[in-house]
């Protein structure tokens, strides 16, 4: 599958390449789509901020050790977070999908979130709630389940910003490693200052 060739690269490379890719979730009643505007790379056994740090396999992180293209879904502070596993089976690396520029199904997203505007999908737990994604998707294979990506119908960022990941204190050198990737100026990026907002259309080539 083409999408697996896309996913099974070096994790930081995949995290950058996913920016602008179309993401689709189809439940029983609604199709939700959008474009990825923010990702974070997690580099497995060596990465002190990663769930795969140290290589210990527990029931909660089993999906992280599966083949590239597996969905690793976990809950943090009641929010469901979605990661795409990268690399080969047994290497617990992945990309966290942090924010989405919504496209299709915005009305339903507004209902699911009780929000509208840029707050709708500008965070890793916000977009999953907007898309109505259940935790049961953990361990599923991307594009072989209700969640998929489309690398053919995508956008391309004008500028990609690299920075330290969000909420990673006290992890030594890993706290500030530039493993967070964002579309510069896109107002759906999490924690962006309003003074840095651009028209979303102006952030793509």
Swiss-Prot record:
Keywords: DNA damage, DNA repair, Hydrolase. The keyword Lipid biosynthesis does not apply. CDD domains: AAG. It comes from the Bacteria. One of its GO terms (biological process) is base-excision repair. SUPFAM superfamilies: FMT C-terminal domain-like. Its EC number is 3.2.2.-. Pfam families: Pur_DNA_glyco. It is an enzyme of class 3 (hydrolase). GO terms for molecular function: alkylbase DNA N-glycosylase activity; DNA binding. Belongs to the DNA glycosylase MPG family. HAMAP family: 3MGH. This is Putative 3-methyladenine DNA glycosylase. It comes from Staphylococcus epidermidis (strain ATCC 35984 / DSM 28319 / BCRC 17069 / CCUG 31568 / BM 3577 / RP62A).
């Amino acid at each position: 599958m083409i999408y697996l060739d896309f996913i099974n690269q070096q994790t930081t490379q995949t995290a950058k390449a996913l920016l602008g890719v179309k993401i689709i979730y189809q439940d029983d009643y609604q199709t939700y789509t959008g474009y990825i505007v923010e990702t974070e790379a997690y580099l497995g056994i060596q990465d002190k901020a990663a769930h795969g740090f140290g290589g210990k396999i527990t029931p909660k992180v089993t999906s992280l050790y599966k083949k590239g293209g597996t969905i690793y879904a976990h809950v943090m502070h009641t929010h469901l977070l979605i990661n795409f596993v990268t690399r080969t089976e047994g290497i617990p690396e992945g990309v966290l999908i942090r924010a989405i520029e919504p496209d299709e199904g915005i009305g339903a997203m507004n209902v699911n979130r009780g929000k509208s505007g840029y707050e709708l999908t500008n965070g890793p737990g916000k977009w999953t709630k907007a898309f109505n994604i259940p935790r049961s998707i953990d361990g599923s294979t991307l594009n072989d389940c209700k969640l998929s990506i489309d690398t053919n119908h995508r956008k391309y960022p004008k500028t990609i910003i690299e920075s330290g990941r969000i909420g990673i204190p006290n992890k030594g050198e890993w706290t500030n490693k530039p493993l967070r990737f964002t579309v510069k100026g896109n107002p759906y990026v999490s924690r962006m200052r309003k003074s840095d907002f651009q028209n979303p259309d102006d952030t793509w080539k």
